[in-house]
Each structure stands twice: as structure tokens, then as C-alpha cells.
From Swiss-Prot:
InterPro entries: UPF0145_dom_sf, UPF0145_YbjQ-like. HAMAP family: UPF0145. It comes from Thermosipho melanesiensis (strain DSM 12029 / CIP 104789 / BI429). It comes from the Bacteria. This is UPF0145 protein Tmel_1129. Belongs to the UPF0145 family. It holds the Pfam family YbjQ_1. The lineage of its organism: Bacteria, Thermotogati, Thermotogota, Thermotogae, Thermotogales.
């Protein structure tokens, strides 16, 4: 599955748009790690547990979007965008969405 933030894939032309696809997840941290992160904010610097949480959540949201595209028979997802929002303290929603398409090589 080709995934791109652009609306075109080099070397291919879009044969068919199969639909809008998305994946989302609301992810939270373990209470103990949340408390440790609160202390880290006092000292400043990166809060690695939250960075890891957001990376994990983003990857899971992408997997879910790909699953939707595969169900539609798509070869690629173009115009991919990400959105995140805080749901509550220590929990965030990640939404990823794009347009699922079928491709043809440009020389055909």
C-alpha cells in the first residue's frame, strides 16, 4: 500500500477513487508513567513516555486507515492528513485520513 501526503504518486496515474478512508485511536498512558511525566514537566525537556504514546497511537491509526483502504480494493492512499486532540489529561486522539485510490502505471 502506497501512502502519500501528496495528491499524486510519481510514475502512476489515478485510475479510480474508491473513497475516503480514516483510522483513529484514543490512547492513554499508564497512571504511574503519567505521574512520572508530570514531574518531568517541572524540569523541562522531552517527555519520552508521551512521545512514545503518540508514536504508537499514530502507527495504530495508520494501520486502521490501511485496513479500510484494503477493504475497498485500493492500491494507495493519497492526500493523507493527521489530526490530534487531547481528550483528557494523559489521553489523546489521533485521526489519520486520506483518499483511497486505484493506480495505473503512467506508461499504460
Amino acid at each position: 500500500m502506497i501512502i502519500s501526503t501528496t495528491d499524486k504518486i510519481p510514475g502512476y496515474k489515478i485510475k479510480e477513487i474508491t473513497g475516503i478512508v480514516m483510522g483513529n485511536i484514543v490512547h492513554s498512558k499508564h497512571l504511574g508513567k503519567d505521574i512520572a511525566a508530570a514531574f518531568k514537566t517541572l524540569a523541562g525537556g522531552e517527555i519520552k513516555s508521551y512521545t512514545e504514546m503518540m508514536t504508537e497511537a499514530r502507527n495504530k491509526a495508520i494501520e486502521r486507515m490501511i485496513d479500510e483502504a484494503e477493504k475497498l480494493g485500493a492500491d494507495a492512499i493519497v492526500s493523507v492528513r493527521f489530526s490530534s486532540s487531547a481528550i483528557m489529561s494523559g489521553a489523546a486522539e489521533i485521526l489519520v485520513y486520506g483518499t483511497a485510490v486505484k493506480l495505473l502505471p503512467k506508461d499504460i
